Amino acid sequence: MLSSFLMLSIISSLLTICVIFLVRMLYIKYTQNIMSHKIWLLVLVSTLIPLIPFYKISNFTFSKDMMNRNVSDTTSSVSHMLDGQQSSVTKDLAINVNQFETSNITYMILLIWVFGSLLCLFYMIKAFRQIDVIKSSSLESSYLNERLKVCQSKMQFYKKHITISYSSNIDNPMVFGLVKSQIVLPTVVVETMNDKEIEYIILHELSHVKSHDLIFNQLYVVFKMIFWFNPALYISKTMMDNDCEKVCDRNVLKILNRHEHIRYGESILKCSILKSQHINNVAAQYLLGFNSNIKERVKYIALYDSMPKPNRNKRIVAYIVCSISLLIQAPLLSAHVQQDKYETNVSYKKLNQLAPYFKGFDGSFVLYNEREQAYSIYNEPESKQRYSPNSTYKIYLALMAFDQNLLSLNHTEQQWDKHQYPFKEWNQDQNLNSSMKYSVNWYYENLNKHLRQDEVKSYLDLIEYGNEEISGNENYWNESSLKISAIEQVNLLKNMKQHNMHFDNKAIEKVENSMTLKQKDTYKYVGKTGTGIVNHKEANGWFVGYVETKDNTYYFATHLKGEDNANGEKAQQISERILKEMELI
């Protein structure tokens, strides 16, 4: 999750920069004017897009399963004999899935991230100390106060808490303070430039204060401290500073007489030339911002009089286009596209009394009473958490195969290819019944190979199967990218039993019969186990099914998560104890 977020954050912000660059270029071309620098704040928003949860978005996924998992069908395997009427022939068979340990990598990434942020924080503290030095060394002047009043009058901006001073510890004009603003001019500027030139410089700094540019700059500083690894923030910050200076120049030029425009440009150029090479306030400048390309500014000032007035409608359209680009990419780049949690709110009866059955496991149990249309749930948060379906997915893979005529009602046989598998039950010809009873992987892998990926995606979307993510390896259902919650397992069984799916009713009945564990006069007991073995440890156990009585049907799903021994057999044992306690079997 962490690596996905960091990666998607960079991609999202880079895409946003590309869009802004394109829109900005077209805007300049067709309006002969500049856009507001505030458009670059969208880049900050884009870095947070991966944190936004979106439901049922699936086509574009950076799945950790794609990067971290490698399936082995020749490593260790586990066989569990299941309790029940057909225990002599029904086994919970599963093979191991090797996964690289991602926890250490995650911790390492987190450590590097925090270390980088701490370095940025240290640099920020250094900047604040430099600012304190500048403030303490700055001197007030009645002359500058008079110039400030003149400039405020010209700009019609009478902010109460604003002061002006000069300091020999800076080489270019600066503005401090988010609430109480302080303009500080370099001593060399005050000593060298004339009254008009100083007023031009003050007008420019006042424009920064009036536009609240320092606030936007501080936002960028905070984001750069947190997302220091993201090159998009450095690119966009440079562009924002350049545009910010031009916007402030434009604001000043608006209030000056036409014949003063050239003199204003000359003053800006002169102020830049007066910079000292011996003053080091880089840290403070990093915090305060507004570095710019002086050549671009002078060129803009020189061409200002020939530029048409800004078109407000076109500017609004440009902003809307950039904002829409964020909305479009948001669902595509959300780190939650895998949807490891099923987002739903259902009314249910709590089954807290079942806790002893799940001792030693993080587990959940979901029961749906068809007649009463009511859910009963143990551990509701866990029942919404999605996990690999493992062999429980074979139910729906079989239905897809029937729909694509890979299987028929009269012919479900597949010949064994003589490959030696870990279980003797797998080393023989199979049909639907035997493959379901013994969870024969190769049988369903063969079916899956004959299904196009887009077909599988369509089926999963049609029946609303979990996160619908099949971007992992070829066994995407076996501790890979495809995930589903216990509540969704129950809903799927209900829809299948009620024939509310696209599939043929007779095909559904054929699959149901292959899952039947017990048939009595008073009830029919149907179920399927699933076991996820990760690095030779049973970490994920499923048992899903239903009990059909004469006047009702009860759908259930039990899931177990643990360090080891969380398997389908254990899930079935717990399920049957619960169902017996409820007097359903």
Curated annotation (Swiss-Prot):
InterPro entries: Beta-lactam/transpept-like (IPR012338), Beta-lactam_resp_regulator (IPR052173), PCN-bd_Tpept (IPR001460), Peptidase_M56 (IPR008756). Residues 351-585 are annotated as: Beta-lactamase-like. Pfam families: Peptidase_M56, Transpeptidase. Penicillin-interactive protein and potential antirepressor. NCBIfam families: blaR1_generic, sensor_MecR1. Keywords: Antibiotic resistance. It comes from the Bacteria. One of its GO terms (molecular function) is penicillin binding. It comes from Staphylococcus aureus (strain N315). Belongs to the peptidase M56 family. This is Methicillin resistance mecR1 protein. One of its GO terms (biological process) is response to antibiotic.
